[in-house]
Amino acid sequence: MITITGLTKTYGCRRVLDGLDISAAPGQITLLVGANGCGKTTTLRQVCGLSSPDAGRVVIGTSDLAASPRAALAQLSFLPQSPRFHPKLTAGDILEFYARLRGLPSSRIAAVEAQWGLADARDQATARLSGGTRQRLALAVLSLPDAPVLVLDEPGLSLDPDWRRFLYAELRAAARRGATVLVATHLLGEWNGQADRCLALEAGRVGRELPSARLLDAFPFARSRPALVHAG
């Protein structure tokens, strides 16, 4: 469960979040959509403790992020919009590092490596990986701890259509197992019908809520927008 109450964040003279209230429930995929600059990424950064709000509260499970950050963040796994890895480390090095950080066994590394099709990339430096393979590596890192709360910023970017479909299926499976899944995206056509709830951010708040099956009705411009697919 993620509960956001009265979240406010200002950068310079610009208020990006203005008393934002959001809840994301276990067993559901909650989608954040909206125009560029509406606060999607800022919201996720607040949830993950990467930036502090000017006001408001974030609770993950039953743990207040400000009062008990370690307990709150231990429940969470985060995929940033543009994952970065040390260019000289291999994909295997990256997975081993994050597994050790979480105290996970090598069997868990093997499981996510197989899940995200990374066996051939294991010994390759991340600088030599295609954009799609790097994104799958980031998704493997996200999947390592099997966390009860998943937070993803534009997870479908750089993936080819088959891997996108696999990603959506994996997130639905995680939700069925009881995970809380919070996703920010602008790929509205890709996500039409994929989520349980869709929250449209406007002027730093939730402007409206709609079923994700109605995304293309609510945002008709997405029907003609070409799919942003970068194969790899």
Model-derived segments and spans:
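Conserved ABC ATPase "signature" region
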Residues: 96, 106-121
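Helix-to-loop junction immediately C-terminal to a conserved catalytic motif
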Residues: 48
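Q-loop/switch helix immediately C-terminal to the Walker
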Residues: 88-101
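Helix N-cap at the start of a conserved alpha-helix in ABC-type nucleotide-binding domains
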Residues: 161-163
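Catalytic Walker B motif of ABC-type/P-loop ATPase nucleotide-binding domains
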Residues: 150-154
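Conserved ABC transporter NBD signature motif
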Residues: 56-67, 71-72
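Conserved structural motif at the start of ABC-family nucleotide-binding domains
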Residues: 2, 17-19, 73
